[in-house]
UniProtKB/Swiss-Prot annotation:
GO terms for biological process: translation. This is Small ribosomal subunit protein eS4z. It is found in: Cytoplasm. Belongs to the eukaryotic ribosomal protein eS4 family. The keyword Ion transport does not apply. The keyword S-adenosyl-L-methionine does not apply. GO terms for molecular function: mRNA binding; rRNA binding; structural constituent of ribosome. One of its GO terms (cellular component) is cytosolic small ribosomal subunit. Residues 42-104 form the S4 RNA-binding domain. InterPro entries: KOW, Rib_uL2_dom2, Ribosomal_eS4, Ribosomal_eS4_C, Ribosomal_eS4_central_region, Ribosomal_eS4_central_sf, Ribosomal_eS4_KOW, Ribosomal_eS4_N. Pfam families: 40S_S4_C, KOW, Ribosomal_S4e, RS4NT. Keywords: Cytoplasm, Ribonucleoprotein, Ribosomal protein, RNA-binding, rRNA-binding.
Amino acid sequence: MARGLKKHLKRLNAPKHWMLDKLGGAFAPKPSSGPHKSRECLPLVLIIRNRLKYALTYREVISILMQRHIQVDGKVRTDKTYPAGFMDVVSIPKTNENFRLLYDTKGRFRLHSIKDEEAKFKLCKVRSIQFGQKGIPYLNTYDGRTIRYPDPLIKPNDTIKLDLEENKIVEFIKFDVGNVVMVTGGRNRGRVGVIKNREKHKGSFETIHIQDSTGHEFATRLGNVYTIGKGTKPWVSLPKGKGIKLTIIEEARKRLSAQQA
């Protein structure tokens, strides 16, 4: 008889973008239930131990968390396997550091260091807009938030700029041709570009055609696209490379020039 969720995760079955060693042990941290899907998140233990190197062992991570040093989106989190995900702000007040979880062009999570001003907000993609009791409108975001009385102009797939201190919508970006987006799924995950065209297919997925700043065009599904700014200017700072995917030859040339320098 089943007794709830599985509490274990084998290391070989863990998502590739966690970048865990095969020989580092048999098991990996199983993400807790939370705002992000288990295959699209990064547990806090991996952020503190594997990425930031503030701990050497699992036990040290628990000690740091229990001292209430780690905040995600402005709230203290003590769960070692809390699932942090795309666009989340991880803050460490003790060291005056703030990081935003973004993707690199290889589809892996990148902890991008940000300033205090930028850590006060996050961009949330709108999943749906519904009406509750007595006709009260509310919207649902990609990270499980419910916000009542949104602007009537906000529609699904738009992006809202959310003030993390007051939990209020400051501004919003329409999902329109000409706006800058980041791809959050599929083989183009982590790439940044401007929407060029939107193909609608009845009874199937909508296809979005995107062009990056170097002029390369690619296409992906509507569900994989996340608006991050109006026009060509993103509202959040981007990691090194600015979401431009290099070919294998370009990468090799870049490595050679770095070695020679």
